[in-house]
Amino acid sequence: MTTIQQQRSSLLKGWPQFCEWVTSTNNRIYVGWFGVLMIPCLLAATTCFIVAFIAAPPVDIDGIREPVAGSFMYGNNIISGAVVPSSNAIGLHFYPIWEAATLDEWLYNGGPYQLVIFHFLIGISAYMGRQWELSYRLGMRPWICVAYSAPVSAAFAVFLVYPFGQGSFSDGMPLGISGTFNFMFVFQAEHNILMHPFHMAGVAGMFGGALFSAMHGSLVTSSLIRETTGLDSQNYGYKFGQEEETYNIVAAHGYFGRLIFQYASFNNSRSLHFFLASWPVICVWLTSMGICTMAFNLNGFNFNQSVVDTSGKVVPTWGDVLNRANLGMEVMHERNAHNFPLDLAAAESTSVALVAPAIG
């Protein structure tokens, strides 16, 4: 009994030091308890992604025995390469290595995709928790991790919620450049995302956030308080940790208020920076919500043949042009799976030409 207690005490001897090291804010890079989970998960996801991108064999993504190659060793380059999503034959089943009869079978059915995305999602969630943990240790407010939740929600939407809604991980976003574009085209074809208000909010958030960031940076740079001569860079006029303002917010406020109008300019630095953070974050949240609703086929607005003249004849609009483009993309994707688009099969045929050409 004494021997067992001595062994246990020797095993736990370094535990307090380990806890202190994990939670110490004096480390060059903060680890934290969330970091204990984050580091192995992101390492596993990154390692599997790199190996699969270089050497993974083709994957039967559609479940029809027609494998799609995505790795360098099978003829792809950095643009066309991808980690191909797991097979439609697997569906939503959890598919770790031990569920396959052989490693070749696991690779053929796209097992690396699930390994990467599951470890990646756990890793970025732990990274978000680590941001909160470090803020808590330093006595800061928790808004950094709240802002980071926007891209995290987007990742969960395309890698987890959308496959759940569509019934198969084969519908998830491929892990590559061309695969991402293919995912976007197919998403537009099947869900008309461009006509969804939440996607429009996301576009406003991205372009608006870039505009506001450029406006703020240029205003601050243009109203710096000169502390140097003309021979030195103005950057030398700032000392890290100085208490004085480094730019004149009154001058920036006055300039922008006269450029647009008075109330278009913030006179409070704190509310200004809250707006700069909240605008893109809220809009990306909305976009993620839109992806999650479209995952269950609550799609964007449909304005097909919505304008008619007094005789009931359809007056074509850009909505009809968009619909025709959607149909074209839909019939082209998964062209060997022989899944005829339901909206083409169910609706009346749309004439391409108004008058049949004369023969002879």
Curated annotation (Swiss-Prot):
InterPro entries: D1/D2 (IPR055266), Photo_II_D1/D2_sf (IPR036854), Photo_RC_L/M (IPR000484), Photo_RC_L/M_CS (IPR055265), PSII_D1 (IPR005867). SUPFAM superfamilies: Bacterial photosystem II reaction centre, L and M subunits. Keywords: Calcium, Chlorophyll, Chromophore, Electron transport, Herbicide resistance, Iron, Magnesium, Manganese, Membrane, Metal-binding, Oxidoreductase, Photosynthesis, Photosystem II, Thylakoid, Transmembrane, Transmembrane helix, Transport. GO terms for molecular function: chlorophyll binding; electron transporter, transferring electrons within the cyclic electron transport pathway of photosynthesis activity; iron ion binding; oxidoreductase activity, acting on diphenols and related substances as donors, oxygen as acceptor; oxygen evolving activity. [CaMn4O5] cluster binds at residues 171, 190, 333-334, 343, 345. PROSITE patterns: REACTION_CENTER. It comes from the Bacteria. The record marks 162 as: Tyrosine radical intermediate. A quinone binds at residues 216, 265-266. The D1/D2 heterodimer binds P680, chlorophylls that are the primary electron donor of PSII, and subsequent electron acceptors. It shares a non-heme iron and each subunit binds pheophytin, quinone, additional chlorophylls, carotenoids and lipids. D1 provides most of the ligands for the Mn4-Ca-O5 cluster of the oxygen-evolving complex (OEC). There is also a Cl(-1) ion associated with D1 and D2, which is required for oxygen evolution. The PSII complex binds additional chlorophylls, carotenoids and specific lipids. Chlorophyll a PD1 binds at residue 199. The chain crosses the membrane at residues 30-47, 119-134, 143-157, 198-219, 275-289. It is a multi-pass membrane protein. Chlorophyll a ChlzD1 binds at residue 119. Residues 346-360 form a propeptide. GO terms for biological process: photosynthetic electron transport in photosystem II; response to herbicide. Fe cation binds at residues 216, 273. Cyanobacteria usually contain more than 2 copies of the psbA gene. 2 of the reaction center chlorophylls (ChlD1 and ChlD2) are entirely coordinated by water. PSII is composed of 1 copy each of membrane proteins PsbA, PsbB, PsbC, PsbD, PsbE, PsbF, PsbH, PsbI, PsbJ, PsbK, PsbL, PsbM, PsbT, PsbX, PsbY, Psb30/Ycf12, peripheral proteins PsbO, CyanoQ (PsbQ), PsbU, PsbV and a large number of cofactors. It forms dimeric complexes. Photosystem II (PSII) is a light-driven water:plastoquinone oxidoreductase that uses light energy to abstract electrons from H(2)O, generating O(2) and a proton gradient subsequently used for ATP formation. It consists of a core antenna complex that captures photons, and an electron transfer chain that converts photonic excitation into a charge separation. The D1/D2 (PsbA/PsbD) reaction center heterodimer binds P680, the primary electron donor of PSII as well as several subsequent electron acceptors. HAMAP family: PSII_PsbA_D1 (MF_01379). This is Photosystem II protein D1. The gene is psbA1.
